[in-house]
């Protein structure tokens, strides 16, 4: 058996499999990528033990825990842990602080003939390590912010750069009012943990300059960490440009064709299309006040007609109508205003090929 470990850096850099022995309610609030929740106690059992601890102390709480998790319940849980240990011989287990729960799991596994290491300090210590990692990256590394009108393909650029940090990808959201995906977003703590691990791995690969997309503080329901967002407000910018026609086609691809396919993959043909249509109309409704009543109604009618035609024949051509209107009358004026206020920070502007070449050259020079 490997020794119990407090080398959190190695655990995250190597994507070491980990078993989380906390209760499901704790796990749902935040965990680490790829970790499996195999709790010692379920939520109700944990609550009872916690109440007992407050009223009668630790010894009574431990005794109650053993009474609640015994017999067949205990056997089923131990068997699940054994299966995990056999499937992941290089893995570790942890609880919240690396205390009684993970020690109990470790001891019961040993009683069953399985030696398995635990993470010293548990979830809390690993979470603190990742928050420190995030702080150090923001403090010590340089950042370049990639801006551009809606539909210029900023994410396409980021995916081609080894030093990019894709905040929208980590948040599973495209960042705009239309940015929700067919699958949900991570919890805030999960978002922060994934971001910190991404930064940790890139720095371990020698990357000290990062390219991030120009985002508001909120990417859907995920908050960009305050110190990172504040740092982004003063960083140099690169502005991505493309023709209006290309941008319309890209938005059609991303927000209609691909999003519809996502919903159908997740929910099936009939329900998937209905949920896709509902999501698109709701996204437009979210900016009703900013569009104004007349413009919202006009774009909504165009969108509804396009959705009906798509459902009837599979054709998506009519969607270009509302996309062109939304870009020309809403997003483009808004982004033009933002660019004017950020002009002093923009050190380069160009199309995808030019911007990629510039950012790659810039990363090699710094």
Curated annotation (Swiss-Prot):
Keywords: Selenium, Transferase. Residues 12-135 form the Rhodanese domain. InterPro entries: Rhodanese-like_dom, Rhodanese-like_dom_sf, SelU. One of its GO terms (biological process) is tRNA wobble uridine modification. Its EC number is 2.9.1.3. SUPFAM superfamilies: Rhodanese/Cell cycle control phosphatase. The keyword NAD does not apply. One of its GO terms (molecular function) is tRNA 2-selenouridine synthase activity. It catalyses: 5-methylaminomethyl-2-thiouridine(34) in tRNA + selenophosphate + (2E)-geranyl diphosphate + H2O + H(+) = 5-methylaminomethyl-2-selenouridine(34) in tRNA + (2E)-thiogeraniol + phosphate + diphosphate; 5-methylaminomethyl-2-thiouridine(34) in tRNA + (2E)-geranyl diphosphate = 5-methylaminomethyl-S-(2E)-geranyl-thiouridine(34) in tRNA + diphosphate; 5-methylaminomethyl-S-(2E)-geranyl-thiouridine(34) in tRNA + selenophosphate + H(+) = 5-methylaminomethyl-2-(Se-phospho)selenouridine(34) in tRNA + (2E)-thiogeraniol; 5-methylaminomethyl-2-(Se-phospho)selenouridine(34) in tRNA + H2O = 5-methylaminomethyl-2-selenouridine(34) in tRNA + phosphate. The active site is at residue 95. SMART domains: RHOD (SM00450). Monomer. Involved in the post-transcriptional modification of the uridine at the wobble position (U34) of tRNA(Lys), tRNA(Glu) and tRNA(Gln). Catalyzes the conversion of 2-thiouridine (S2U-RNA) to 2-selenouridine (Se2U-RNA). Acts in a two-step process involving geranylation of 2-thiouridine (S2U) to S-geranyl-2-thiouridine (geS2U) and subsequent selenation of the latter derivative to 2-selenouridine (Se2U) in the tRNA chain. Belongs to the SelU family. This is tRNA 2-selenouridine synthase. It comes from Pseudomonas syringae pv. syringae (strain B728a). The gene is selU.
């Amino acid at each position: 058996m490997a020794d119990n470990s407090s080398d959190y850096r190695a655990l995250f850099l190597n994507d070491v499999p980990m078993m989380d022995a906390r209760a499901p309610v704790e796990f749902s609030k935040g965990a680490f990528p790829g970790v499996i929740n195999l709790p010692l106690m379920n939520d109700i059992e944990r609550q009872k033990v916690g109440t007992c601890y407050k009223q009668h102390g630790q010894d009574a709480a431990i005794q109650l825990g053993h009474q609640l998790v015994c017999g067949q319940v205990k056997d089923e849980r131990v068997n699940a842990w054994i299966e995990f240990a056999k499937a992941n011989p290089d893995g570790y287990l942890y609880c919240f602080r690396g205390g009684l729960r993970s020690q109990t799991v470790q001891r019961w596994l040993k009683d069953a003939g399985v030696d398995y290491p635990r993470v010293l300090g548990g979830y809390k210590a690993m979470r603190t390590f990742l928050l420190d990692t995030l702080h150090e990256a923001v403090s010590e590394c340089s950042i370049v912010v990639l801006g551009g009108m809606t539909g210029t393909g900023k994410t396409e650029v980021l995916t081609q750069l080894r030093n990019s940090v894709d905040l929208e990808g980590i948040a599973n959201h495209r960042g705009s009012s239309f940015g929700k995906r067919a699958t949900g977003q991570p919890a805030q703590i999960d978002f922060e943990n994934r971001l910190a691990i991404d930064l940790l791995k890139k720095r371990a690969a020698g990357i000290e300059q990062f390219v991030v997309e120009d985002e508001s503080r909120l990417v859907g329901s995920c908050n960009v960490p305050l110190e990172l967002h504040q740092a982004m407000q003063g960083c140099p910018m690169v502005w991505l440009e493309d023709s209006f026609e290309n941008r319309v086609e890209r938005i059609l691809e991303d927000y209609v064709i691909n999003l519809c396919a996502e919903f159908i993959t997740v929910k099936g043909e009939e329900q998937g299309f209905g949920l896709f249509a509902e999501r698109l109309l709701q996204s437009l409704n979210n900016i009703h006040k900013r569009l104004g009543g007349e413009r919202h109604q006009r774009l909504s009618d165009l969108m509804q007609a396009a959705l009906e035609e798509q459902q009837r024949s599979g054709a998506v051509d009519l969607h270009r109508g509302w996309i062109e209107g939304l870009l020309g009358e809403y997003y483009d004026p808004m982004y033009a205003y933002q660019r004017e206020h950020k002009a002093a920070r923009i050190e380069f502007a160009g199309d995808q090929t030019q911007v990629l070449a510039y950012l790659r050259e810039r990363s090699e020079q710094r």
